[in-house]
Regions:
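Phosphate/pyrophosphate-binding catalytic cores of soluble transferases and nucleic-acid-acting enzymes
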Residues: 1-316
Length: 316
């Protein structure tokens, strides 16, 4: 792999909704093409959040290096700007070793910002704005705050879960502080050309019911893998684990821990939240240009992905 300054490094990305088989495909391609994985998942960066984030297990890695996993404690903040900087450094190291960087994950904003080379300018939050937004959240409620975000920046609202209060407030904070949408900032900060030569493989199913069945099965497996105890740790530290406390896979069990609900309805709520999240992921990726979509249920999906990857690398 050419590491010269004048030639763009090739980067492969495997994207798609939750439970679509991204991890297994990414590992298979890494084995075949000498790759290393960069996780593009906003929650797998955190230590100890393993079951609820469907973090790759040592057995599933098959010896392939995985980067961007288990780096931070759950009480440490991590933004898309942080990810873009981290992924850029990892890409440089992996390409420098003569290996193929393979971005694997379902956080569309991370994938797009990295592959498109978005530059994030530091912005100073006006004094008192963050506290004001927090007070408004308490007074008006999360539905009103999300409705405001939908009104001022509908593109950002599509990418953010209505119950992810942290991200909703951050997006509103950016808008009120700068007068610009996050989506506008992203467009304004795009470089003249993309920094990498990339192939993006997307996984989806012909029938949405196939994906939903896989999601339901995954949740059942998570329950067998002691998700409840992991969620309880997040509940016990919810005042400091602010990002995790808003994450799908954990917050659905809070009513159970508070003695306000039986367990079974919480499990069903998690399945529904995961299905809704998958729909939002697909909406995001369908708006991204240049994705080569593959039928995740096809028996030869790995062969199709390998053929496309081989053709992509041959063009370099």
């Amino acid at each position: 792999m050419d590491g010269s300054c004048n030639k763009k490094h090739p980067v492969l990305a495997v994207v798609g909704p939750t439970a679509s088989g991204k991890t297994a495909l990414g590992v298979a391609l890494a084995e075949q093409f000498g790759g290393e994985i960069i996780s593009a998942d906003s929650m797998q960066i955190y230590k100890g959040l393993d079951v609820g984030t469907a973090k790759v297990t040592p057995e599933e890695t098959r010896g392939i290096p995985h980067h961007g996993v288990d780096i931070l404690q759950p009480d440490e903040p991590f933004s898309v700007a942080d990810f873009t900087a981290l992924a850029g450094a990892l890409e440089h190291e992996i390409s420098g070793r003569g290996h193929l960087p393979i971005l694997v994950g379902g956080t569309g904003l991370y994938v797009q910002s990295f592959l498109y080379g978005v530059r994030f300018a530091a912005e100073k939050t006006p004094d008192g704005l963050r506290e004001q937004l927090a007070a408004e959240l308490t007074q008006k409620g999360p539905e009103a705050m999300y409705a405001e975000l939908q009104a001022v920046d509908p593109e950002a609202a599509v990418a953010i879960h209505p119950n992810n209060h942290v991200r909703v407030l951050r997006a509103l904070e950016h808008y009120r502080a700068t007068g610009k949408k996050l989506s506008e900032q992203k467009a304004d900060s795009l470089p003249p050309e993309k920094p990498y030569r990339s192939l993006i493989l997307g996984l989806d199913f012909p029938e949405r019911a196939q994906l939903y069945c896989r999601i339901d099965l995954r949740v059942d497996q998570m329950m067998e893998q002691d998700l409840l105890n992991e969620a309880k740790r997040v509940w016990e530290h919810r005042d400091t684990y602010k990002t995790a406390a808003q994450a799908i896979g954990y917050k659905e069990f809070f009513p159970y821990f508070a003695g306000e609900s039986a367990l079974a309805p919480c499990v069903e709520k998690l399945k529904q939240a995961s299905r809704n999240y998958a729909k939002r992921q697909l909406t995001w990726f369908r708006h991204m240009e240049g994705i080569c979509w593959l039928d995740a249920s096809a028996p030869d999906v790995r062969e199709q992905a390998a053929r496309l990857t081989n053709e992509f690398l041959a063009k370099g």
